[in-house]
């Protein structure tokens, strides 16, 4: 049986509106589990998630890294 890995998590908050943003940026927000202002989402800290956060520095901020 596989042992469960306790991975690190990162919490992001949406601080910008997706209105008048390209469809790719809207899709990235949805991929992060965000869709409305000031909502927070806790995700596994992976390179893919970090890349999505890096693409949207004007729309999201990292609240907590655990």
From Swiss-Prot:
The answer to whether keyword Mitochondrion applies is no
* Record-annotated membrane-spanning stretches: none
InterPro entries, per database record: Ribo_uL30_ferredoxin-like_sf, Ribosomal_uL30_bac-type, Ribosomal_uL30_ferredoxin-like
SUPFAM superfamilies in the record, alphabetically?
Ribosomal protein L30p/L7e
**N-terminal signal peptide:** none
Q: Does the keyword Nuclease apply?
A: no
The organism's place on the tree of life at top rank: Bacteria
Q: Name one GO molecular function term.
A: structural constituent of ribosome
How does the annotation summarize its subunit structure?
Part of the 50S ribosomal subunit.
Query: Which family is it part of?
Result: Belongs to the universal ribosomal protein uL30 family.
Could you tell me what this protein is called? Large ribosomal subunit protein uL30
Q: Which organism is it from?
A: Brucella anthropi (strain ATCC 49188 / DSM 6882 / CCUG 24695 / JCM 21032 / LMG 3331 / NBRC 15819 / NCTC 12168 / Alc 37)
């Amino acid at each position: 049986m596989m042992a469960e890995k306790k991975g690190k998590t990162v919490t992001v908050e949406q601080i910008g509106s997706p209105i008048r943003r390209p469809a790719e940026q809207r899709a990235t927000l949805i991929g992060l589990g965000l869709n409305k202002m000031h909502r927070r989402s806790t995700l596994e800290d992976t390179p893919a998630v970090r890349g999505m956060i890096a693409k949207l520095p004007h729309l999201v901020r990292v609240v907590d890294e655990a």
